[in-house]
Amino acid sequence: MRTSQYLLATQKETPADAVVISHQLMLRAGMIRKLASGLYTWLPMGLRVMRKVEAVVREEMNAAGALEVLMPSIQPAELWQESGRWEQYGPELLRLKDRHQRDFCVGPTHEEVITDLARNELSSYKQLPLNMYQIQTKFRDEIRPRFGLMRGREFIMKDAYSFHADQASLQETYDRMHQAYSNIFTRLGLDFRPVQADTGSIGGSYSHEFHVLAESGEDDVIFSDSSDYAANIEKAEAIPRETARLAPTEELRLVDTPDAKTIAQLVENYGLPIEKTVKTLIVRGAEEGKLVALIVRGDHELNEIKAAKLEQVADPLVMATDAELREAIGAGAGSLGPLNLPLECIIDRSVALMSDFGIGANIDDKHYFGVNWERDLPVPQVADLRNVVEGDPSPDGQGTLVIKRGIEVGHIFQLGTKYSEALKCQVLGENGKPVVLSMGCYGIGVSRVVAAAIEQSYDDKGIIWNDALAPFQIALVPLRYETDVVREATDKLYAELTAAGFEVLLDDRDKKTSPGIKFADMELIGIPHRIVVSDRGLADGNLEYKHRTEQDAQALPLNEVLTFLQARVRR
């Protein structure tokens, strides 16, 4: 491809509303253009990258035995009402009416549609297992679209759904898809981690997320430094570093604390070590009108996903209002604690191992210091309530936990029978009796992968693509292309490289475009291999080669270029 026949839409300045690197560089490199909030047009340069992601995804899905389909973006409300998600999904679901006033939505996901397809097409266990996928545009009406493609409203996604007569078959396909996802992200040259995850709004019983590691990531990815254990922050089990509770050394005492509305103030103004403090958080209970106290150490954070799974706690988690606290306890949020608290208490594992600690006295501006379990109050129910912190013991007993930032690019679920039961999707089993199908669900954010790859690999000059993802593998840059000797050598090399199967972008812009601008554009776009053709080099029988990640260029004999690139470029 020649730049004279291509839309080379690079920009020198960074748009003011672009915050994250991938958004900035995709705009500057001429890969996307913003149409409206959260909506982007893919330009030819960006689309080449996305098509490469799609190709790898398609190859690995096909190799794993999945069958490609294409479902409508617009879905009838009746299906979502059958599953119960029409109201549950919330305002992110874009709803609309047709001219006949029938309700529809723009699909953010396709569990209902695929289950409807399966219940109409499948009748016997002999047709199972069946795994179908599509690569299609999705829409979620995000309240605050941001970060370019990382959190847009419209995006490209690969979603697959599998159907099974039993759990063993589901597990087999799930494991196959887990491996397929690992193959995909490995082939794309990404540094990634598969982690145990919560199933979230999709539902189901078992899931894994696939995260590309990047400092700009929105999610915490937790993994052991000595084993294969890995989980996201919602799922990671928090194991206390302490193994036993120390014996009491202090007496219980009531202290006036007018300057301790927060943990930070309690530590700063009263000299209490933060690991000797607790947070008493009051939430609404599962039973109407009931409140429940959740207690974590002062230097730890409540994990709301874990808390909402407790049978006594309302899901989703809702914090009690100040008025509710006053009515139930008679004190404000900064003065609460488990001693003499007229509510059911659930404490974190780390709290159960504390001694000589401080708590709110359930009286405004008063705290108890020197509190000890069993001596001053009984140990209530103990549960895993907190987020892990770096250095915690790994739950598998091997090593300690490391926390990195990650960008979620894939998620696989074992849905079980959640949707098949709701939509009555069943077949005749081997014994001739109806069997409700078990389902799996497997998603990859195709457009998000492109942005995540940039977040993982860039420098101050622009994007650094690997060979698998680059829009073009080779940038061929002639200097003084208007001269016969340079033009003839360049055109001949371009023809040879193209015939050999390389993806080449020939920068044939005229002399009004300086060599510096040409080099800067190719580095901004991130093309991994650059060949420079100049009359001076040709006089010596050489070309100039430079890899995008290298500082210095090297002379390359003209007659060795093809052999060199065939060995260097990964195809």
Swiss-Prot record:
Keywords: Aminoacyl-tRNA synthetase, ATP-binding, Cytoplasm, Ligase, Nucleotide-binding, Protein biosynthesis. InterPro entries: aa-tRNA-synt_IIb, aa-tRNA-synth_II, aa-tRNA-synth_II/BPL/LPL, Anticodon-bd, Anticodon-bd_dom_sf, Pro-tRNA-ligase_IIa, Pro-tRNA-synth_IIa_bac-type, Pro-tRNA-Synthase_IIa_type1. Homodimer. It is found in: Cytoplasm. The keyword Chloroplast does not apply. The gene is proS. NCBIfam families: PRK09194.1, proS_fam_II. The lineage of its organism: Bacteria, Pseudomonadati, Pseudomonadota, Gammaproteobacteria, Pseudomonadales. Belongs to the class-II aminoacyl-tRNA synthetase family. ProS type 1 subfamily. It is an enzyme of class 6 (ligase). This is Proline--tRNA ligase.
